[in-house]
Curated annotation (Swiss-Prot):
Family: Belongs to the adenosylhomocysteinase family.
Catalysed transformations (reactions): S-adenosyl-L-homocysteine + H2O = L-homocysteine + adenosine
Function recorded in the entry: Adenosylhomocysteine is a competitive inhibitor of S-adenosyl-L-methionine-dependent methyl transferase reactions; therefore adenosylhomocysteinase may play a key role in the control of methylations via regulation of the intracellular concentration of adenosylhomocysteine.
Pfam family, one: AdoHcyase_NAD
GO CC terms of this entry: cytosol
Pathway: Amino-acid biosynthesis; L-homocysteine biosynthesis; L-homocysteine from S-adenosyl-L-homocysteine: step 1/1
UniProt source species: Caenorhabditis elegans
EC numbers, comma separated: 3.13.2.1
UniProt name for this protein: Adenosylhomocysteinase
Annotated keywords: Hydrolase, NAD, One-carbon metabolism
Length: 437
């Protein structure tokens, strides 16, 4: 593979200059990652690491990649979604010599090919670290390249869906490398998942359709962190939001925020917009499509494309019109139309540019710290054994701290007496691990 593969494969390398300009802008909005370069760059803690990354190849990810290389790592990259690559970002990184295999609009076969190119490096040596988003790279290495598992020091996983995958693998005895669950760092799940989607969801819907959100009935399937951000965003735009949930605790939270909570079967006949956020499959199926009013918009912000039954639409619709890339209008047998965005994949990345740089700096700083933890602790008494871990609270607080100055935040300082009264160190950590923010 190492001898025959191309040095990179992107849509158009001539987009690199445009990509570089946007990367420079993003760096100004990503103080956590820039602080990682300043703090760790001189000591090169990732020297010797060969990181295979599978995560949306965006401008923000470009800043992450260049932070990893600044810390000494060799990196190869693919995207974790066929529509999420920003081609100018991929070109800019490829131009620096980092092997990137990603372009917007990959086929499923091309998608797997791209991931496979990141397994073995140009010198013939295989990966020894994994940075994943959703679990596709992790699953591929375990299933198809088990001979490399013994040499992998660890992996870090970005998203809820990927963490669920790791937990299942661990329970079955299938996970063979230690893993850090980046998603459940407070500075990831309570920021990226909540505040990130709050801005990127309406961006995706509006770029795709130019729809007026005010006054529309919007159904949000799922009220986890992503669902909470989605519902809050749509409500802020003036939509009348209905939530569907399986969990009584989340359902009660939604009700206490003033949302109507009911089943999708009851909500569908009046739903102008449906957003799935569950991480589960078969959320919007044929029976729901047939209940929708004319020209209802259906989209997803869960990681995979199994939440919306796109296959049913392609099989049962009498006509499919592609309005523009990632915007398809289906004519149903009942004469009504359904507008599907991003083919049921992530609408905020398929139809827009994903979360803003600042909130992604939170998430990606956690990724850098996770990679440093796994790589540098290997072979020491603090080595991460086989298992699924979260980053220590001290690092979670550090990530938050690195982003305060840019927002003009001034922290109150505990006195020694106050710290003693609370039973916490003056410099933190301030909350127990079980605290729910």
């Amino acid at each position: 593979m190492a001898q025959s593969k191309p040095a990179y494969k992107v849509a158009d390398i001539k987009l690199a200059d445009f990509g570089r300009k946007e990367i420079i802008l993003a760096e100004n909005e990503m103080p956590g990652l820039m602080a990682m370069r300043s703090k760790y760059g001189p000591s090169q803690p990732l020297k010797g690491a060969r990181i295979a990354g599978c995560l949306h190849m965006t401008i923000q990810t470009a800043v992450l990649i260049e932070t990893l290389t600044a810390l000494g790592a060799e990196v190869q990259w693919s995207s974790c979604n066929i529509f999420s690559t920003q081609d100018h970002a991929a070109a800019a990184i490829a131009q620096t010599g980092v092997p990137v295999y990603a372009w917007k609009g990959e086929t499923d076969e091309e998608y797997e090919w791209c991931i496979e190119q990141t397994i073995v490096f140009k010198d013939g040596q295989p990966l020894n670290m994994i940075l994943d988003d959703g679990g596709d790279l992790t699953n591929l290495v375990h299933a198809k390249y088990p001979q490399y598992l013994a040499g992998i020091r660890g992996l870090s996983e970005e998203t809820t869906t990927g963490v669920h995958n790791l937990a299942k693998m661990l329970a079955k005895g299938d996970l063979k490398v230690p893993a850090i669950n980046v998603n459940d760092s407070v500075t990831k799940s309570k920021f990226d998942n909540l505040y990130g989607i709050r801005e990127s969801l309406p961006d995706g819907i509006k770029r795709a359709t130019d729809v007026m959100l005010a006054g529309k009935v919007a159904v949000v399937a799922g009220y986890g962190d992503v669902g909470k951000g989605s519902a809050a965003s749509l409500k802020a735009f003036g939509s009348r939001v209905i939530v569907t949930e399986i969990d009584p605790i989340n359902a009660l939270q939604a009700a206490m925020e003033g949302y109507e909570v009911t089943t999708l079967e009851e909500a569908a006949p009046k739903a102008n917009i449906i957003v799935t956020t569950t991480g589960c499959k078969d959320i919007v199926t044929g029976k729901h499509f047939e209940l929708l009013p004319n020209d209802a918009i259906v989209c997803n912000v869960g990681h995979f494309d199994c939440e919306i039954d796109v296959k049913w639409l392609n099989t049962n619709a009498t006509k499919k019109d592609t309005i523009k890339p990632q915007v398809d209008r289906y004519t149903l047998k009942n004469g009504r139309h359904v507008i599907l965005l991003a083919e049921g994949r992530l609408v905020n990345l398929g139809c827009a540019t994903g979360h803003p740089s600042f909130v992604m700096s939170n998430s990606f700083t956690n990724q850098v710290l996770a990679q440093v933890e796994l790589w540098t602790k290997f072979g020491t008494p603090q080595e991460y054994k086989l298992g699924l871990y979260v980053l220590p609270k001290t690092l979670d607080e550090e990530v938050a701290y690195l982003h305060l100055a840019q927002l003009g935040v001034k922290l109150t300082k505990l006195s020694d007496e106050q710290a003693s009264y609370l039973g916490v160190p003056v410099a933190g950590p301030y909350k127990p691990d079980h605290y729910r923010y």
